[in-house]
Amino acid sequence: MIPRKLLIAIGNVSSFFLVSASPRSWSSLQQRDSCTFNSSTNPQCWGDYSLDTNYYDEVPNTGVTREYWFELQNTTAAVDGVERIVLTVNGTIPGPTIVADWGDNIVVHVTNGLQNNGTSIHFHGVRQLNTNQMDGTNSLQQCPIAPGDSFTHSFTAQQYGHSWYHSHFAVQAWNGVFGGIVINGPASAPYDVDMGVLTLSDWYHDTTDYLWATEARSGTPPSVNNGLINGTNVYNSGGKRFGTTFQAGKKYRFRLVNTAMDTQFKFMIDNHNMTVMASDFVPIVPYETDVLSIAIGQRYDIVIEANQVPSNYWMRAFPATDCSGSNESADNIRGIIRYDPSSTEDPTSSAYTYTTDCNDEPIASLVPYLSMNASTPASTQAVDIDFNTNITDTGLRKWTINGDDFQAYWDAPTLQQGLINSSYFNATSGIARLTDDNSWVYFVIENNGANAPPISHPIHLHGHDFYVLAQEGGATYSSTGTTLQLTNPPRRDTAVLPASGFLVIGFITDNPGVWPLHCHVS
């Protein structure tokens, strides 16, 4: 059972939703005049494709397969100088980065070398069009991979940008089972150097299994010991900081991912502005900011120009304290940018002013480069989030959606049960069954129940990009009074449900399967 994880699926017991519509086939690829070759100064082009290509319908057929072999292992590590039990992918935290080009086939062989636990690997934000069985959510699309067993994932890189993969087995990911994904493609802003994935994590000196057992009875999130940038940081006198070097005049692309368990971050690099050019897997019209709010599971592509006086500068990830667990290292989650690679001195730069709220980046800033409008829905689902403290005789405190908490049946995945008996979906609570092909559906997700604490939730949908139609904290949704943004609203797969407020999302039922919709706080 997964606490603090609100799962609406596209089909399983307890707070899920189901898309059982027919697929929308990729349109036949049209031959066109070749776009100028992709380069740092002309990143909008990608062979015969470009940023103007509708990537929901058209995908390059590269004929290339990128193959990876992952083994999960039990070990100990001191990523911040404090040794603890961890779980790793191929012996590292984060695990190896999956790298592919837009249109490639990706094959990942996962071997469970853990001593006592099952596992499954989910490829966060990857659309998995017509490959629902490869999504990697155990108890929904597959059984857990047993110790000593293997499972092979095979899917097409239908999007481009970056994301992360992580275990979807209980709270295993936050013991170290995660890594980056990079899918090369066009970009909406020029850059000179691709710095790859930059992960932002909170870090505990106890295992997440121990923390879960404690939190489930107390109802209070555990205190955080530290935070990591790309899997490393200092703590007291141990550990080391993440660091990299800038060359004056160059533009550097960072692919940010918030891989935290219970922390939204405010990210910045002292004295440097950021050009934000993608949110999740969606290229956007570039905008500038000096502080970036990034919720759990979200990704942003940013470009930093090395245009400051050559020196050393702090890279910082501050916890957004309005929704994040208290962190004893809140002001010390830092990396170092050096203009002189031989320098060993700590920076003396100062942080930008930032707010402690847990809001998303403004809707007005997240303008998709490829413009698409939302349409009138065939149906609207209401989803309420509540915190109930009297569920079981054991005293466990659980989060619920529409009164249901998530139940994991590892030996009876929802997808399998639905194929065996189609009436299963009608008899099981927590499922929204969406049966109309290629139709719009809206979800109104509210966070103002009588027992709901006033904190935000990062809401993640598998198998789809959704349209963010409305998002407001401290307010109640009204079908007549709430204004929806239907003209080119933000599209993404993870968005913040504001504290004591609501989030309205819309999407098209064009990807049949069993897909979870859940809060990404662990």
Predicted regions and their residues:
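Fungal secretory targeting signals
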Residues: 1-28
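Short, hydrophobic/aromatic beta-strand segments
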Residues: 81-83, 117-124, 255, 263-270, ...
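Asparagine-centered strand-capping/turn motif at beta-strand->loop junctions
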Residues: 110-115, 256-260, 445-449
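N-terminal, post-signal-peptide metal-ligating segments of extracellular/periplasmic oxidoreductases
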Residues: 18-147, 192-193, 220-252, 377-386, ...
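Extracellular/periplasmic metallocenter environments
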Residues: 115-116, 128, 139-193, 292-344, ...
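Active-site pocket scaffolds in enzymes
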Residues: 130-142, 277-290, 331-334, 377-522
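Divalent metal-coordination and catalytic microenvironments
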Residues: 70, 108, 121, 167, ...
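Histidine- and aromatic-rich segments of cupredoxin/plastocyanin-like copper-binding domains
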Residues: 132-139, 143-146, 199, 204, ...
